[in-house]
Regions:
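Solvent-exposed, charged interface segments at domain starts and junctions
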Residues: 1-8, 72-82, 130-136
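Cysteine/selenocysteine-centered motifs that mediate thiol-based redox chemistry or coordinate metal-sulfur cofactors
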Residues: 3, 32-34, 102-147
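Surface-exposed loop/turn and secondary-structure junction residues enriched for glycine/proline
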Residues: 39-41, 49-51, 63-70, 86, ...
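Non-catalytic, beta-rich accessory domains that mediate macromolecular interactions or localization
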Residues: 12, 62, 77-78, 86-89, ...
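A hydrophobic, small-residue-rich beta->alpha segment in the mid-to-C-terminal subdomain
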Residues: 75-116
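Residue-level preference for alpha-helix termini and adjacent loops
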Residues: 13, 37, 45-47, 59-66, ...
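Charge-rich, low-complexity N-terminal segments
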Residues: 1-33
Length: 147
């Protein structure tokens, strides 16, 4: 399980969280009207997705993907989020959530619990998807032995 208090893990958890949950927490954090400045407007952009080639372990540019980044400063604490696809609301909300957790806002325990639940749901979804496609795996060594 990923730790929402670790910033790298939190970035992944926020990116996987649904827009409504992020927006709800962002609105709750902003209820007290803390000082907020937007350091990077949420705007969709292209990002080169790089993977590691499995044979020689060299970096390989897989292609460009659309992401929406945003950065805020909330009461002196910076927050950042990068959401897959075009979703300005989720990116801005995610940046606010990141800043709130980093600053240990009153809503942090509820936010952390929700991020952990989203992580568990995503892991379960990946397991189901893998289980559904697993039977289509081809074992080339077995095929060679049969010839």
């Amino acid at each position: 399980m990923s730790d929402p208090h670790d910033r790298s893990n939190r970035f992944e958890l926020i990116a996987a969280c649904d827009e409504e949950t992020l927006a709800g927490f962002a609105n709750e954090v902003l209820e007290d009207d803390p000082p907020l400045s937007i350091r990077q407007d949420p705007r969709p952009q292209l990002l080169m997705q790089q993977v590691q080639e499995p044979v020689e372990r060299r970096p390989f540019n897989l292609g460009e993907v659309v992401v929406t980044p945003a950065e805020v400063e909330l009461g002196g604490t910076r927050g950042f989020a990068m959401i897959p696809g075009k979703n300005e609301r989720a990116a801005l909300s995610g940046a606010i959530v990141d800043a709130a957790v980093a600053a240990n806002h009153d809503r942090t325990p509820a936010i952390v619990e929700s991020l952990r639940a989203a992580d568990a749901q995503q892991r379960a979804k990946r397991r189901r998807s893998w289980a559904e496609s697993r039977h289509t795996t081809v074992d080339f060594q077995t095929m060679e032995e049969q010839q």
